[in-house]
């Protein structure tokens, strides 16, 4: 099974990707996480990618496509995966279809701009285990202590400020809305209400994927 999660930054794709992947025992591939890992390296590629991220610009198709293709051609992904944040435009979708022939399901997370901004501005994660939190919606049960691993060290993303977030959302709309129209005609396109609670969204996705 190949599942694509589409939606703007802050729509909840990563949270649901991890949950659903665990339930159906498939890898969760998040393009955002992949590039954030690359940025932490001291390479010319990292510097180039970081410049796009800081300005709220999308990373060029040729860079994104090659990174994703290298990942997906690995044998560990031969049985399927959940792909989070890719493709983001028609050019990427057609590149993806050029080397992936299996049937896919596309799930789009529909969320208002106002809620997206609040979700992104408030989010942070445990530096040790990666558990995601939000200052507005999901704080640790004990202040400054991760619910999962007990660590007290958290990571706040430097690219998350309101001006950059608004630009990212607008860039996303320009790039991705034509892709949504393209996938709507595929017969395997589904929309979930991303404004619902985590649990409600998870249930909706399970119904789409026919997970018991």
Swiss-Prot record:
Alphabetically ordered keywords of this record: ATP-binding, Cytoplasm, Kinase, Metal-binding, Nucleotide biosynthesis, Nucleotide-binding, Transferase, Zinc
Binding residues for Zn(2+): 126, 129, 146, 149
Pathway: Purine metabolism; AMP biosynthesis via salvage pathway; AMP from ADP: step 1/1
Protein EC: 2.7.4.3
Catalytic activity: AMP + ATP = 2 ADP
Pfam families for the chain: ADK (PF00406), ADK_lid (PF05191)
PROSITE patterns for the chain: ADENYLATE_KINASE
Amino acids binding AMP: 36, 57-59, 85-88, 92, 157, 168
Record-level GO BP terms: AMP salvage
GO terms for MF: adenylate kinase activity; ATP binding; zinc ion binding
Principal location class: cytoplasm
Keyword Transcription attached: no
InterPro entries, sorted: Adenyl_kin_sub, Adenylat/UMP-CMP_kin, Adenylat_kinase_CS, Adenylate_kinase_lid-dom, P-loop_NTPase
UniProt function note: Catalyzes the reversible transfer of the terminal phosphate group between ATP and AMP. Plays an important role in cellular energy homeostasis and in adenine nucleotide metabolism.
Name of this chain's protein: Adenylate kinase
Annotated disulfide bonds: none
Residues annotated as binding ATP: 10-15, 123, 132-133, 196
Family that this chain belongs to: Belongs to the adenylate kinase family.
Compartment(s) of residence: Cytoplasm
Domain comment (free text): Consists of three domains, a large central CORE domain and two small peripheral domains, NMPbind and LID, which undergo movements during catalysis. The LID domain closes over the site of phosphoryl transfer upon ATP binding. Assembling and dissambling the active center during each catalytic cycle provides an effective means to prevent ATP hydrolysis. Some bacteria have evolved a zinc-coordinating structure that stabilizes the LID domain.
GO terms under cellular component: cytoplasm
């Amino acid at each position: 099974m190949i599942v694509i999660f589409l939606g703007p930054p802050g729509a909840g794709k990563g949270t649901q990707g991890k949950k659903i992947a665990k339930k159906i025992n498939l890898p969760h591939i998040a393009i955002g996480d992949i590039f954030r890992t690359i940025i932490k390296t001291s390479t010319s590629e990292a510097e180039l990618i970081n410049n796009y991220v800081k300005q709220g610009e999308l990373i060029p198709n040729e860079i994104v496509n090659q990174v994703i293709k290298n990942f997906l051609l690995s044998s560990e992904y031969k049985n399927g995966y959940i792909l989070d944040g890719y493709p983001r435009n028609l050019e990427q979708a057609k590149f993806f279809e050029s080397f992936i022939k299996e049937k896919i399901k596309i799930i789009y997370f529909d969320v208002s701009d106002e809620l997206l901004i609040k979700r992104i501005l408030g989010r942070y994660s445990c530096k040790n285990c990666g558990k995601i939190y939000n200052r507005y919606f999901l704080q640790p049960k004990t202040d400054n202590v991760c619910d999962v691993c007990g660590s007290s060290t958290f990571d706040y993303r430097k690219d998350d400020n309101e001006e950059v977030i608004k630009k990212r959302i607008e860039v996303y709309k320009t790039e991705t809305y034509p892709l949504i129209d393209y996938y709507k005609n595929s017969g395997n396109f589904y929309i979930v209400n991303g404004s619902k609670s985590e649990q409600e969204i998870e249930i909706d996705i399970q119904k789409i994927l026919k997970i018991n």
